[in-house]
């Protein structure tokens, strides 16, 4: 039998585990309807599993119409506007914001309030429109500049102070490149401060995933189609091992993917991929061999 290894370093990060525990605890102790603002995790199968337990996912429009309900805020965090709206509408918040994200929100809010009178610009290196980034921008009353890549650095006014932060799940390498590029553009005497706000539990998975991928002839990377972290990690996985395949469920694996038969098979995933899903993938592969 071809050896199959599930990566011990893959699976939910602490923030996601914490949010799911919050949801399950609330569902177990109360019969009251529990809503979640947005997918609790970017993994369709896990969302469906919790949905069967009673967790109902809603969007922001539906949230604005709720009255007297109970709503879980996921690990990504939310802007102040959501808390204000909840208070006005009698909505009870179950706050499962990741502690790492919460610290970052507070740091951004503090620096924004301390420097806005000086004309400083808060810049966030992250994915525009991502839930976490929306929550971070909200700490600056919507004024923060979001930068996805070096190509967007012209949005910054280099004659004014710059305060740079990063979305917690971005790569250290990418953040370092942004810091270097901004540094070379700053006008003499103008302040530039940068804060390393990247979660190490997530960042450390990048070198780990590469080492895991090279240790196996064939790799199946398991993640939801919506997972930003999954796309980033799979890119590193593929770079380390060209015979890496992205899948979102076990059913998509067909016998042809196993040809030629590999000496070993590795299964890994994103920070939004549950362990049980990777185990299902392993079982499916064994049935095909």
From Swiss-Prot:
Recorded GO MF terms: 4 iron, 4 sulfur cluster binding; 4-hydroxy-3-methylbut-2-enyl diphosphate reductase activity; metal ion binding
GO terms, biological process: dimethylallyl diphosphate biosynthetic process; isopentenyl diphosphate biosynthetic process, methylerythritol 4-phosphate pathway; terpenoid biosynthetic process
Keywords: 4Fe-4S, Iron, Iron-sulfur, Isoprene biosynthesis, Metal-binding, Oxidoreductase
Sequence positions that bind dimethylallyl diphosphate: 42, 76, 130, 227-229, 272
Binding site for isopentenyl diphosphate: 42, 76, 130, 227-229, 272
Active site per database record: 132 (proton donor)
Keyword Oxidoreductase part of the UniProt annotation: yes
CDD domains: lytB_ispH
Cofactor note as given: Binds 1 [4Fe-4S] cluster per subunit.
Pathway the protein takes part in: Isoprenoid biosynthesis; dimethylallyl diphosphate biosynthesis; dimethylallyl diphosphate from (2E)-4-hydroxy-3-methylbutenyl diphosphate: step 1/1; Isoprenoid biosynthesis; isopentenyl diphosphate biosynthesis via DXP pathway; isopentenyl diphosphate from 1-deoxy-D-xylulose 5-phosphate: step 6/6
Positions that bind (2E)-4-hydroxy-3-methylbut-2-enyl diphosphate: 42, 76, 130, 168, 227-229, 272
Binding-site residues, [4Fe-4S] cluster: 13, 98, 199
EC number: 1.17.7.4
Cofactor list: [4Fe-4S] cluster
Transmembrane residue ranges: none
Catalytic activity: isopentenyl diphosphate + 2 oxidized [2Fe-2S]-[ferredoxin] + H2O = (2E)-4-hydroxy-3-methylbut-2-enyl diphosphate + 2 reduced [2Fe-2S]-[ferredoxin] + 2 H(+); dimethylallyl diphosphate + 2 oxidized [2Fe-2S]-[ferredoxin] + H2O = (2E)-4-hydroxy-3-methylbut-2-enyl diphosphate + 2 reduced [2Fe-2S]-[ferredoxin] + 2 H(+)
Function statement: Catalyzes the conversion of 1-hydroxy-2-methyl-2-(E)-butenyl 4-diphosphate (HMBPP) into a mixture of isopentenyl diphosphate (IPP) and dimethylallyl diphosphate (DMAPP). Acts in the terminal step of the DOXP/MEP pathway for isoprenoid precursor biosynthesis.
Family: Belongs to the IspH family.
Name of the protein in its database record: 4-hydroxy-3-methylbut-2-enyl diphosphate reductase
């Amino acid at each position: 039998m071809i050896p199959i290894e599930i990566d011990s370093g893959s699976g939910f990060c602490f923030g996601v585990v914490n949010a799911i525990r919050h949801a399950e605890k609330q569902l177990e102790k109360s019969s009251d309807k529990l809503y979640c603002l947005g997918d609790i995790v970017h993994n369709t199968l896990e969302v469906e599993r919790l949905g069967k337990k009673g967790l109902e996912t809603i969007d922001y429009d539906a949230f604005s119409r709720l009255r007297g309900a109970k709503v879980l805020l996921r690990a990504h965090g939310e802007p102040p506007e959501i808390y204000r709206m909840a208070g006005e509408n009698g909505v009870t918040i179950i706050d499962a914001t990741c502690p790492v994200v919460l610290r970052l929100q507070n740091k951004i809010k503090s620096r924004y309030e301390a420097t806005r009178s000086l004309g400083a610009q808060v810049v966030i290196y992250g994915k525009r429109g991502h839930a976490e980034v929306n929550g971070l921008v909200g700490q600056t009353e919507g004024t923060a500049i979001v930068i996805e890549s070096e190509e967007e650095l012209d949005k910054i006014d280099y004659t004014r102070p710059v305060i740079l932060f990063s979305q917690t799940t971005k790569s250290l390498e990418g953040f370092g490149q942004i810091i270097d590029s901004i540094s070379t553009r700053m006008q003499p005497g103008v302040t530039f401060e940068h804060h390393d706000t990247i979660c190490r539990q997530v960042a450390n998975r990048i070198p780990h995933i590469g080492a895991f991928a090279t240790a196996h002839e064939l790799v199946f990377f398991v993640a939801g189609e919506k997972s930003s972290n999954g796309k980033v990690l799979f890119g590193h996985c593929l770079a380390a091992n060209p015979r890496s395949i992205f899948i979102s469920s076990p059913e998509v694996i067909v016998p042809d993917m196993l040809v030629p038969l590999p000496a070993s098979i590795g299964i890994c995933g994103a920070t939004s991929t549950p362990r049980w899903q990777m185990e299902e993938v392993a079982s499916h592969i064994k049935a095909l061999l």
